[in-house]
Protein backbone atom coordinates (compact mmCIF):
# COMPACT_ATOMS: atom_id res chain seq x y z
CA UNK A 1 0.00 0.00 0.00
CA UNK A 2 1.35 3.40 -0.91
CA UNK A 3 1.12 6.68 0.95
CA UNK A 4 1.03 9.18 -1.89
CA UNK A 5 -0.04 12.17 0.12
CA UNK A 6 1.58 15.47 0.80
CA UNK A 7 3.19 15.45 4.23
CA UNK A 8 0.96 16.02 7.15
CA UNK A 9 1.33 19.50 8.65
CA UNK A 10 2.47 17.85 11.85
CA UNK A 11 5.07 15.19 10.10
CA UNK A 12 4.67 16.03 9.34
CA UNK A 13 3.46 13.59 12.27
CA UNK A 14 3.94 14.05 11.77
CA UNK A 15 4.91 11.20 12.63
CA UNK A 16 7.94 13.04 14.00
CA UNK A 17 6.16 14.96 16.75
CA UNK A 18 4.82 11.65 18.03
CA UNK A 19 8.37 10.55 18.72
CA UNK A 20 8.46 13.07 21.53
CA UNK A 21 4.88 13.19 22.75
CA UNK A 22 3.76 9.59 22.44
CA UNK A 23 6.68 7.27 22.97
CA UNK A 24 8.06 5.14 25.76
CA UNK A 25 11.24 5.35 27.77
CA UNK A 26 14.07 3.22 26.55
CA UNK A 27 14.80 0.67 29.26
CA UNK A 28 18.31 0.11 30.63
CA UNK A 29 20.40 -1.95 28.29
CA UNK A 30 20.23 -5.66 28.83
CA UNK A 31 22.17 -8.45 27.26
CA UNK A 32 20.96 -9.50 23.84
CA UNK A 33 18.85 -12.60 24.02
CA UNK A 34 20.09 -15.69 22.32
CA UNK A 35 17.95 -17.15 19.58
CA UNK A 36 15.35 -19.21 21.40
CA UNK A 37 13.15 -19.96 18.43
CA UNK A 38 13.62 -23.69 18.85
CA UNK A 39 12.44 -23.54 22.45
CA UNK A 40 9.23 -21.67 21.67
CA UNK A 41 6.05 -23.62 21.05
CA UNK A 42 5.00 -23.79 17.43
CA UNK A 43 2.74 -20.93 16.34
CA UNK A 44 -0.25 -21.48 14.14
CA UNK A 45 -0.63 -17.84 13.08
CA UNK A 46 -0.87 -17.90 9.29
CA UNK A 47 -1.70 -14.29 8.46
CA UNK A 48 -1.33 -10.85 10.00
CA UNK A 49 -5.09 -10.46 9.62
CA UNK A 50 -5.51 -12.98 12.43
CA UNK A 51 -4.09 -10.43 14.88
CA UNK A 52 -7.38 -8.50 14.57
CA UNK A 53 -5.90 -5.33 16.04
CA UNK A 54 -4.37 -7.04 19.05
CA UNK A 55 -1.12 -5.53 20.28
CA UNK A 56 1.78 -7.03 22.17
CA UNK A 57 1.80 -6.53 25.90
CA UNK A 58 3.99 -3.84 27.41
CA UNK A 59 7.68 -4.62 27.01
CA UNK A 60 11.02 -3.14 27.90
CA UNK A 61 13.09 -1.77 25.05
CA UNK A 62 16.69 -2.72 24.46
CA UNK A 63 17.80 -0.75 21.41
CA UNK A 64 20.66 -2.52 19.68
CA UNK A 65 22.51 -0.79 16.84
CA UNK A 66 25.18 -1.37 14.22
CA UNK A 67 26.10 -0.39 10.67
CA UNK A 68 25.96 -2.59 7.59
CA UNK A 69 28.89 -3.00 5.20
CA UNK A 70 27.22 -0.54 2.83
CA UNK A 71 26.89 2.14 5.51
CA UNK A 72 23.25 1.79 6.54
CA UNK A 73 22.57 2.51 10.20
CA UNK A 74 20.55 -0.26 11.88
CA UNK A 75 18.43 -0.06 15.05
CA UNK A 76 16.83 -3.21 16.41
CA UNK A 77 14.51 -4.11 19.28
CA UNK A 78 13.79 -7.77 19.97
CA UNK A 79 10.12 -8.33 20.84
CA UNK A 80 8.96 -11.94 21.22
CA UNK A 81 5.32 -11.34 22.15
CA UNK A 82 3.97 -12.11 18.67
CA UNK A 83 5.41 -14.21 15.83
CA UNK A 84 5.94 -11.23 13.53
CA UNK A 85 8.34 -8.41 12.80
CA UNK A 86 8.26 -4.87 11.42
CA UNK A 87 10.93 -3.52 9.08
CA UNK A 88 11.15 0.17 8.17
CA UNK A 89 13.81 1.55 5.82
CA UNK A 90 14.07 5.34 5.85
CA UNK A 91 15.97 7.20 3.15
CA UNK A 92 17.00 10.86 2.99
CA UNK A 93 14.99 10.91 -0.22
CA UNK A 94 12.11 13.28 0.43
CA UNK A 95 11.07 16.27 -1.62
CA UNK A 96 13.88 18.38 -0.16
CA UNK A 97 16.09 16.34 -2.52
CA UNK A 98 13.97 17.12 -5.60
CA UNK A 99 16.36 19.77 -6.86
CA UNK A 100 14.94 21.52 -9.91
CA UNK A 101 12.33 18.79 -10.49
CA UNK A 102 9.55 19.06 -7.89
CA UNK A 103 7.79 15.73 -7.50
CA UNK A 104 10.60 13.41 -8.59
CA UNK A 105 11.03 12.09 -5.04
CA UNK A 106 7.30 11.42 -4.62
CA UNK A 107 7.00 9.73 -8.02
CA UNK A 108 10.06 7.56 -7.40
CA UNK A 109 8.66 6.33 -4.11
CA UNK A 110 5.19 5.75 -5.54
CA UNK A 111 6.69 3.63 -8.33
CA UNK A 112 8.66 1.26 -6.08
CA UNK A 113 6.00 -1.44 -5.94
CA UNK A 114 4.75 -1.02 -9.51
CA UNK A 115 7.16 -3.54 -10.97
CA UNK A 116 10.24 -5.72 -10.43
CA UNK A 117 11.84 -8.26 -12.74
CA UNK A 118 9.15 -10.78 -13.68
CA UNK A 119 6.37 -9.15 -11.60
CA UNK A 120 3.95 -6.32 -12.22
CA UNK A 121 2.10 -4.37 -9.54
CA UNK A 122 -0.61 -7.03 -9.23
CA UNK A 123 1.87 -9.87 -8.85
CA UNK A 124 3.79 -7.91 -6.23
CA UNK A 125 0.63 -7.24 -4.22
CA UNK A 126 -0.43 -10.88 -4.49
CA UNK A 127 3.06 -11.98 -3.48
CA UNK A 128 2.94 -10.07 -0.21
CA UNK A 129 -0.70 -10.97 0.43
CA UNK A 130 -0.05 -14.65 -0.14
CA UNK A 131 2.60 -14.57 2.57
CA UNK A 132 0.37 -12.69 5.03
CA UNK A 133 2.69 -9.69 4.73
CA UNK A 134 2.12 -5.95 4.32
CA UNK A 135 4.25 -3.58 2.23
CA UNK A 136 4.08 0.18 2.71
CA UNK A 137 5.74 3.22 1.20
CA UNK A 138 5.54 6.98 1.62
CA UNK A 139 7.36 10.15 0.66
CA UNK A 140 7.55 13.36 2.69
CA UNK A 141 9.71 16.48 2.81
CA UNK A 142 12.73 15.06 4.62
CA UNK A 143 12.39 11.36 3.99
CA UNK A 144 11.03 8.51 1.96
CA UNK A 145 10.05 5.20 3.55
CA UNK A 146 9.62 1.58 2.52
CA UNK A 147 8.26 -0.81 5.14
CA UNK A 148 7.39 -4.46 5.61
CA UNK A 149 5.35 -6.29 8.23
CA UNK A 150 5.68 -10.05 8.06
CA UNK A 151 5.31 -13.20 10.07
CA UNK A 152 8.65 -14.24 11.49
CA UNK A 153 8.47 -17.94 10.61
CA UNK A 154 11.29 -18.70 8.19
CA UNK A 155 9.02 -20.00 5.42
CA UNK A 156 7.11 -16.68 5.41
CA UNK A 157 9.92 -14.32 6.39
CA UNK A 158 12.46 -15.26 3.73
CA UNK A 159 10.25 -14.94 0.62
CA UNK A 160 8.69 -11.73 1.99
CA UNK A 161 12.15 -10.23 2.51
CA UNK A 162 13.28 -11.33 -0.94
CA UNK A 163 10.34 -9.57 -2.55
CA UNK A 164 10.78 -6.49 -0.35
CA UNK A 165 14.46 -6.25 -1.25
CA UNK A 166 13.62 -6.37 -4.95
CA UNK A 167 10.92 -3.72 -4.60
CA UNK A 168 13.10 -1.31 -2.61
CA UNK A 169 16.36 -1.95 -4.43
CA UNK A 170 15.55 -2.96 -8.00
CA UNK A 171 12.24 -1.47 -9.18
CA UNK A 172 11.73 -1.56 -12.95
CA UNK A 173 9.63 1.63 -13.24
CA UNK A 174 7.15 0.42 -15.88
CA UNK A 175 6.14 3.14 -18.33
CA UNK A 176 2.42 2.33 -18.18
CA UNK A 177 2.48 2.60 -14.38
CA UNK A 178 4.17 5.99 -14.59
CA UNK A 179 1.40 7.30 -16.84
CA UNK A 180 -1.27 5.95 -14.49
CA UNK A 181 0.28 7.42 -11.35
CA UNK A 182 0.85 10.77 -13.04
CA UNK A 183 -2.83 10.87 -13.97
CA UNK A 184 -3.79 10.03 -10.39
CA UNK A 185 -1.58 12.82 -9.06
CA UNK A 186 -2.88 15.32 -11.61
CA UNK A 187 -6.44 14.44 -10.61
CA UNK A 188 -5.43 15.01 -7.00
CA UNK A 189 -4.04 18.44 -7.83
CA UNK A 190 -7.34 19.36 -9.47
CA UNK A 191 -9.25 18.25 -6.37
CA UNK A 192 -6.97 20.32 -4.16
CA UNK A 193 -8.02 23.45 -6.06
CA UNK A 194 -11.42 23.01 -4.39
CA UNK A 195 -9.96 22.44 -0.93
CA UNK A 196 -9.27 25.72 0.89
CA UNK A 197 -7.17 23.96 3.52
CA UNK A 198 -4.84 22.56 0.85
CA UNK A 199 -4.68 25.93 -0.88
CA UNK A 200 -3.74 27.63 2.39
CA UNK A 201 -1.12 25.03 3.30
CA UNK A 202 0.66 25.24 -0.05
CA UNK A 203 0.65 29.03 -0.01
CA UNK A 204 1.92 29.10 3.56
CA UNK A 205 4.93 26.88 2.85
CA UNK A 206 5.73 28.91 -0.25
CA UNK A 207 5.66 32.18 1.70
CA UNK A 208 7.49 30.77 4.71
CA UNK A 209 10.32 29.04 2.84
CA UNK A 210 10.74 31.09 -0.34
CA UNK A 211 13.50 29.50 -2.46
CA UNK A 212 14.26 26.76 0.09
CA UNK A 213 13.60 23.08 -0.86
CA UNK A 214 10.86 22.88 1.79
CA UNK A 215 8.83 25.52 -0.08
CA UNK A 216 7.32 23.38 -2.81
CA UNK A 217 4.71 20.66 -2.16
CA UNK A 218 6.24 17.25 -1.53
CA UNK A 219 4.08 15.79 -4.31
CA UNK A 220 5.33 18.39 -6.78
CA UNK A 221 3.01 20.47 -8.90
CA UNK A 222 0.77 19.93 -11.90
CA UNK A 223 3.34 21.79 -13.99
CA UNK A 224 6.33 19.72 -12.84
CA UNK A 225 4.86 16.20 -12.69
CA UNK A 226 3.94 15.96 -16.35
CA UNK A 227 7.50 16.37 -17.58
CA UNK A 228 9.21 13.88 -15.25
CA UNK A 229 10.76 11.00 -17.21
CA UNK A 230 11.62 7.40 -16.42
CA UNK A 231 15.29 8.30 -16.75
CA UNK A 232 14.90 10.91 -13.99
CA UNK A 233 13.21 8.38 -11.71
CA UNK A 234 15.95 5.81 -12.26
CA UNK A 235 18.64 8.42 -11.63
CA UNK A 236 16.95 9.60 -8.42
CA UNK A 237 16.58 6.03 -7.18
CA UNK A 238 20.24 5.26 -7.91
CA UNK A 239 21.31 8.39 -6.00
CA UNK A 240 18.88 8.46 -3.06
CA UNK A 241 17.90 4.83 -2.36
CA UNK A 242 21.41 3.69 -1.52
CA UNK A 243 22.69 1.67 1.40
CA UNK A 244 24.71 4.64 2.62
CA UNK A 245 21.60 6.84 2.58
CA UNK A 246 19.40 4.41 4.53
CA UNK A 247 18.37 3.81 8.14
CA UNK A 248 17.04 0.32 8.82
CA UNK A 249 14.74 -0.15 11.83
CA UNK A 250 13.67 -3.62 12.95
CA UNK A 251 11.30 -4.67 15.73
CA UNK A 252 9.89 -8.09 16.43
CA UNK A 253 10.27 -11.81 16.89
CA UNK A 254 13.89 -12.03 15.74
CA UNK A 255 17.23 -12.88 17.27
CA UNK A 256 20.18 -10.52 16.90
CA UNK A 257 21.67 -12.87 14.32
CA UNK A 258 18.44 -12.93 12.32
CA UNK A 259 18.17 -9.15 12.48
CA UNK A 260 21.75 -8.77 11.29
CA UNK A 261 21.06 -11.10 8.37
CA UNK A 262 17.91 -9.17 7.40
CA UNK A 263 19.67 -5.80 7.57
CA UNK A 264 22.60 -7.12 5.54
CA UNK A 265 20.26 -8.56 2.89
CA UNK A 266 18.27 -5.34 2.55
CA UNK A 267 21.34 -3.11 2.54
CA UNK A 268 23.21 -5.22 -0.02
CA UNK A 269 20.18 -5.19 -2.30
CA UNK A 270 20.16 -1.39 -2.55
CA UNK A 271 22.20 0.69 -5.00
CA UNK A 272 25.68 1.60 -3.76
CA UNK A 273 26.28 5.17 -2.70
CA UNK A 274 26.84 7.61 0.18
CA UNK A 275 24.41 9.51 2.37
CA UNK A 276 22.95 12.66 0.85
CA UNK A 277 23.57 16.01 2.51
CA UNK A 278 20.73 17.70 4.35
CA UNK A 279 19.39 20.93 2.84
CA UNK A 280 20.76 24.24 4.05
CA UNK A 281 19.08 26.03 6.94
CA UNK A 282 16.28 28.35 5.76
CA UNK A 283 16.28 32.06 6.49
CA UNK A 284 13.46 33.88 8.26
CA UNK A 285 10.65 34.96 5.97
CA UNK A 286 9.13 38.43 5.83
CA UNK A 287 6.14 38.64 8.13
CA UNK A 288 2.80 39.55 6.61
CA UNK A 289 -0.70 38.53 5.59
CA UNK A 290 -1.71 36.96 2.28
CA UNK A 291 -5.41 36.49 1.51
CA UNK A 292 -6.63 34.13 -1.21
CA UNK A 293 -10.22 34.62 -2.28
CA UNK A 294 -12.30 31.43 -2.24
CA UNK A 295 -16.09 30.95 -2.38
CA UNK A 296 -17.07 29.35 0.92
CA UNK A 297 -18.88 30.10 4.15
CA UNK A 298 -15.73 29.72 6.22
CA UNK A 299 -12.24 31.15 6.14
CA UNK A 300 -9.16 29.05 6.76
CA UNK A 301 -6.49 30.75 8.86
CA UNK A 302 -2.89 29.54 8.96
CA UNK A 303 -0.15 31.33 10.89
CA UNK A 304 3.48 30.23 10.89
CA UNK A 305 7.10 31.09 11.47
CA UNK A 306 10.30 29.09 11.38
CA UNK A 307 10.79 26.84 14.39
CA UNK A 308 13.61 24.40 15.13
CA UNK A 309 15.43 21.41 13.72
CA UNK A 310 15.53 17.95 15.33
CA UNK A 311 18.87 18.60 17.04
CA UNK A 312 17.77 21.70 18.95
CA UNK A 313 18.24 21.28 22.72
CA UNK A 314 15.17 23.43 23.42
CA UNK A 315 12.79 20.81 21.99
CA UNK A 316 11.60 19.47 25.39
CA UNK A 317 10.73 22.99 26.58
CA UNK A 318 9.08 23.93 23.30
CA UNK A 319 7.12 20.70 23.22
CA UNK A 320 5.62 21.32 26.65
CA UNK A 321 5.15 25.01 25.92
CA UNK A 322 3.23 24.23 22.75
CA UNK A 323 1.18 21.56 24.51
CA UNK A 324 -0.14 24.30 26.76
CA UNK A 325 -0.65 26.83 23.97
CA UNK A 326 -2.48 24.65 21.46
CA UNK A 327 -0.91 21.24 21.10
CA UNK A 328 -3.41 19.34 23.19
CA UNK A 329 -7.17 19.02 22.91
CA UNK A 330 -9.57 20.88 25.18
CA UNK A 331 -8.05 23.07 27.85
CA UNK A 332 -5.24 24.63 25.82
CA UNK A 333 -5.01 28.41 25.67
CA UNK A 334 -6.18 28.51 22.06
CA UNK A 335 -9.03 26.02 22.45
CA UNK A 336 -10.24 27.67 25.64
CA UNK A 337 -10.39 31.20 24.24
CA UNK A 338 -11.36 30.53 20.62
CA UNK A 339 -13.73 27.58 20.88
CA UNK A 340 -14.85 27.03 24.44
CA UNK A 341 -15.47 30.68 25.41
CA UNK A 342 -16.54 32.09 22.04
CA UNK A 343 -17.61 29.18 19.84
CA UNK A 344 -15.63 30.53 16.87
CA UNK A 345 -14.26 27.28 15.53
CA UNK A 346 -14.59 23.53 15.57
CA UNK A 347 -10.94 23.18 16.50
CA UNK A 348 -7.70 25.14 16.66
CA UNK A 349 -4.25 23.71 17.16
CA UNK A 350 -0.60 24.74 17.18
CA UNK A 351 2.40 22.57 16.44
CA UNK A 352 6.17 22.60 16.15
CA UNK A 353 7.39 20.30 13.37
CA UNK A 354 11.15 19.89 13.84
CA UNK A 355 12.84 18.57 10.69
CA UNK A 356 16.36 18.03 9.32
CA UNK A 357 16.61 21.81 9.26
CA UNK A 358 14.27 24.37 10.80
CA UNK A 359 10.72 23.15 10.41
CA UNK A 360 7.62 25.30 10.88
CA UNK A 361 5.71 26.36 13.94
CA UNK A 362 2.07 26.61 12.84
CA UNK A 363 -1.35 27.60 14.13
CA UNK A 364 -4.29 26.32 12.09
CA UNK A 365 -8.05 26.89 12.32
CA UNK A 366 -11.13 27.83 10.33
CA UNK A 367 -14.02 30.06 11.29
CA UNK A 368 -17.09 31.78 9.84
CA UNK A 369 -15.99 34.18 7.11
CA UNK A 370 -17.69 37.21 8.68
CA UNK A 371 -15.71 36.65 11.90
CA UNK A 372 -12.35 35.85 10.32
CA UNK A 373 -10.56 39.16 10.90
CA UNK A 374 -11.54 39.32 14.55
CA UNK A 375 -10.65 35.67 15.06
CA UNK A 376 -7.24 36.21 13.49
CA UNK A 377 -6.53 39.13 15.81
CA UNK A 378 -7.71 37.09 18.80
CA UNK A 379 -5.31 34.26 17.93
CA UNK A 380 -2.43 36.72 17.51
CA UNK A 381 -3.27 38.32 20.87
CA UNK A 382 -3.40 34.91 22.59
CA UNK A 383 0.05 34.05 21.25
CA UNK A 384 1.49 37.44 22.21
CA UNK A 385 0.03 37.23 25.72
CA UNK A 386 1.32 33.68 26.17
CA UNK A 387 4.82 34.71 25.15
CA UNK A 388 4.67 37.70 27.51
CA UNK A 389 3.22 35.91 30.53
CA UNK A 390 4.39 32.33 30.03
CA UNK A 391 2.50 29.30 31.31
CA UNK A 392 1.15 29.04 34.82
CA UNK A 393 2.58 26.49 37.21
CA UNK A 394 -0.71 24.58 37.07
CA UNK A 395 -0.62 24.45 33.26
CA UNK A 396 2.95 23.17 33.31
CA UNK A 397 2.18 20.55 35.94
CA UNK A 398 -0.81 19.33 33.92
CA UNK A 399 1.27 19.12 30.74
CA UNK A 400 3.95 17.13 32.54
CA UNK A 401 1.39 14.68 33.87
CA UNK A 402 -0.11 14.24 30.41
CA UNK A 403 3.31 13.60 28.92
CA UNK A 404 4.25 11.13 31.65
CA UNK A 405 0.99 9.28 31.13
CA UNK A 406 1.46 8.99 27.37
CA UNK A 407 4.94 7.50 27.48
CA UNK A 408 4.11 4.05 28.90
CA UNK A 409 1.17 3.63 26.51
CA UNK A 410 3.06 4.11 23.29
CA UNK A 411 5.02 0.85 23.14
CA UNK A 412 1.95 -1.31 22.69
CA UNK A 413 2.77 -2.16 19.09
CA UNK A 414 5.81 -3.04 17.03
CA UNK A 415 4.67 -0.48 14.46
CA UNK A 416 4.91 2.42 16.90
CA UNK A 417 8.35 1.36 18.10
CA UNK A 418 9.76 0.82 14.61
CA UNK A 419 8.64 4.33 13.67
CA UNK A 420 10.42 5.75 16.70
CA UNK A 421 13.59 3.83 15.88
CA UNK A 422 13.47 5.06 12.30
CA UNK A 423 13.22 8.67 13.46
CA UNK A 424 16.04 8.27 16.00
CA UNK A 425 18.28 6.85 13.30
CA UNK A 426 17.27 9.27 10.56
CA UNK A 427 17.73 12.39 12.68
CA UNK A 428 20.91 11.00 14.27
CA UNK A 429 19.57 11.25 17.81
CA UNK A 430 21.24 9.43 20.71
CA UNK A 431 19.81 6.03 21.60
CA UNK A 432 18.90 7.48 25.01
CA UNK A 433 16.96 10.31 23.39
CA UNK A 434 13.56 9.12 24.60
CA UNK A 435 14.69 8.77 28.19
CA UNK A 436 16.58 12.08 28.02
CA UNK A 437 13.51 13.85 26.65
CA UNK A 438 11.32 12.57 29.45
CA UNK A 439 13.79 13.48 32.19
CA UNK A 440 14.44 16.94 30.79
CA UNK A 441 10.72 17.62 30.32
CA UNK A 442 9.83 16.66 33.88
CA UNK A 443 12.57 18.94 35.26
CA UNK A 444 11.48 22.07 33.37
CA UNK A 445 10.38 25.22 35.21
CA UNK A 446 7.86 27.84 34.14
CA UNK A 447 10.71 30.27 33.51
CA UNK A 448 12.58 27.82 31.27
CA UNK A 449 9.51 27.10 29.14
CA UNK A 450 8.75 30.80 28.79
CA UNK A 451 12.35 31.58 27.84
CA UNK A 452 12.44 28.84 25.19
CA UNK A 453 9.15 29.93 23.62
CA UNK A 454 10.34 33.54 23.44
CA UNK A 455 13.73 32.51 22.06
CA UNK A 456 12.16 30.77 19.08
CA UNK A 457 8.85 32.58 18.53
CA UNK A 458 7.70 36.15 18.07
CA UNK A 459 4.14 37.32 17.56
CA UNK A 460 5.53 39.98 15.19
CA UNK A 461 7.18 37.50 12.81
CA UNK A 462 4.15 35.52 11.72
CA UNK A 463 3.58 34.61 8.09
CA UNK A 464 -0.21 34.45 7.71
CA UNK A 465 -2.35 32.98 4.94
CA UNK A 466 -6.14 33.20 4.89
CA UNK A 467 -8.38 31.50 2.34
CA UNK A 468 -12.05 32.40 2.09
CA UNK A 469 -14.53 34.98 0.75
CA UNK A 470 -14.30 38.72 1.17
CA UNK A 471 -17.36 39.62 3.23
CA UNK A 472 -18.32 42.40 5.67
CA UNK A 473 -16.94 41.64 9.10
CA UNK A 474 -18.85 41.37 12.36
CA UNK A 475 -17.57 41.86 15.91
CA UNK A 476 -16.67 38.78 17.90
CA UNK A 477 -19.03 37.60 20.62
CA UNK A 478 -17.96 38.33 24.17
CA UNK A 479 -16.30 35.42 25.98
CA UNK A 480 -18.58 33.34 28.17
CA UNK A 481 -18.64 29.94 29.81
CA UNK A 482 -21.69 29.14 27.65
CA UNK A 483 -21.20 30.75 24.23
CA UNK A 484 -24.39 31.59 22.36
CA UNK A 485 -22.74 30.50 19.10
CA UNK A 486 -21.89 26.87 19.45
CA UNK A 487 -18.79 25.60 17.63
CA UNK A 488 -19.23 24.96 13.97
CA UNK A 489 -20.06 21.40 12.99
CA UNK A 490 -17.83 19.31 10.81
CA UNK A 491 -15.38 21.72 9.15
CA UNK A 492 -15.61 22.32 5.42
CA UNK A 493 -13.41 20.06 3.33
Predicted segments with their positions:
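Gram-negative bacterial Sec-dependent N-terminal signal peptides
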Residues: 4-30
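M16 family metallopeptidases and their MPP-like homologs
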Residues: 77, 82-112, 121-168, 182, ...
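Generic structural signal for individual residues within well-ordered alpha-helical segments
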Residues: 125, 179, 226, 234, ...
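Short, polar/flexible loop-turn hinges at active-site or ligand-entry regions and domain interfaces
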Residues: 115-118, 168-176
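N-terminal glycine-/lysine-enriched basic segments
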Residues: 189
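Histidine-acidic residue clusters that define the catalytic metal-binding segment
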Residues: 41-64, 206-246, 276-282, 407, ...
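His/Glu-rich zincin catalytic helix
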Residues: 30-134, 147, 152, 158, ...
Amino acid sequence: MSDRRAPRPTLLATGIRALALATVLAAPAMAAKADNSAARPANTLQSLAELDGKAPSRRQLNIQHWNTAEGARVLFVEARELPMFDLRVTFAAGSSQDGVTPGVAALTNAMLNEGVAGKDVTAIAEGFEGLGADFGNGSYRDMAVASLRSLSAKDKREPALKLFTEVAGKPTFPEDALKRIKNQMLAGFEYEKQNPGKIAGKALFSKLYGDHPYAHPSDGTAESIGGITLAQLRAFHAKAYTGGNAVIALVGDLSRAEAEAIAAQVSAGLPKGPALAAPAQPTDAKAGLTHIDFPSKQTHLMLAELGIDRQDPDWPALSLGNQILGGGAFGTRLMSEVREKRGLTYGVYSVFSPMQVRGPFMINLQTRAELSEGTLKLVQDILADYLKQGPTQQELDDAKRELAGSFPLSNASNASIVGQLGAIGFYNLPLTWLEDFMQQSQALTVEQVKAAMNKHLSADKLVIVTVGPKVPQQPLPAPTDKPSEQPLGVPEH
